[in-house]
Design a protein with these regions (language model features):
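Conserved active-site and cofactor/substrate-binding residues in soluble primary-metabolism enzymes
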Residues: 135, 165-169, 194
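Active-site and donor-binding regions of nucleotide-sugar-utilizing enzymes
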Residues: 1-141, 155-162, 177, 190-191
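Nucleotide-activated donor-binding/catalytic signature segment of Leloir-type glycosyltransferases, i.e.
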Residues: 197-201
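Charged active-site motifs of nucleotide-sugar-dependent glycosyltransferases
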Residues: 146-153, 181-182
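Conserved catalytic-core segment of nucleotide-activated headgroup transferases in glycan assembly
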Residues: 158-186
Length: 201
């Protein structure tokens, strides 16, 4: 609210080698438009959110071509892969904001780069929901055919491509716990439930 939407993130959200290759022209066009818009609008600060494959390139461009400070919310997961990107982050990002508490030790302890832990909105939402609905779990279990065992939730993502890529392997890996846990697929609100069935057939 209160902003001007130039591109929807769905136009940029491609995962995997083949989808990126097939949409490379669109990705490059959007990248060029984004860089041009930032320089034309000349904001007081540029706030980049997640999506490091795209946003770190934008940060590099803005740092090289303007004095605009670059803030990055949801820090790139360089502790998981491509740790060498810390050099680019140190060079191109003025302030880094994390939603994972352990990242403070990783960035500040290992790489001597200051980072702000700002809490995790998803975790806060889950905790609030649990407090408000603690007494309703029995009804939830009954409505969903759960038998009272601990729940193992499969969170395959919120984009169709990542669900197609991840869900079959997740189900296979989780199946070894079937006797000990209730396996529950947490569906993304923006994905038609039928899509999950098609992926798992």
């Amino acid at each position: 609210q209160g902003g001007t939407l130039v591109r929807h993130y769905k136009e940029l959200a491609y995962m995997g080698f083949i989808p990126v290759l097939l949409h490379l022209r669109t990705i490059l066009h959007n990248m060029k438009a984004c860089k041009r818009d930032v320089l034309e609008w000349n904001p007081d600060v540029l706030i980049l959110v997640d999506y490091p494959g795209f946003n770190l390139s934008v940060a590099e461009f803005v740092h090289a071509h303007s004095p605009i400070p670059v803030y990055y919310y949801i820090s790139p997961k360089i502790w998981a892969w491509k740790e060498y990107r810390i050099k680019n982050i140190k060079r191109d990002v003025d302030e880094l904001f994390s939603i994972l508490p352990f990242e403070v030790d990783f960035f500040e302890g290992k790489h001597h780069y200051p980072i702000h832990y700002v809490g995790n909105p998803t975790l806060d939402e889950v905790e609030a929901y649990k407090r408000e609905n603690e007494k309703d779990f029995g009804r939830f279990a009954e409505d969903n055919g759960l038998e009272g065992k601990p729940v193992l939730a499969l969170l395959a993502g919120s984009r169709k491509q990542e669900i197609k890529d991840n869900l079959p392997m997740m189900v296979e890996a989780a199946s070894v716990y079937e006797g000990q846990y209730e396996l529950v697929l947490a569906a993304a609100p923006n994905i038609d439930p039928e899509f999950y069935g098609k992926v798992l057939r």
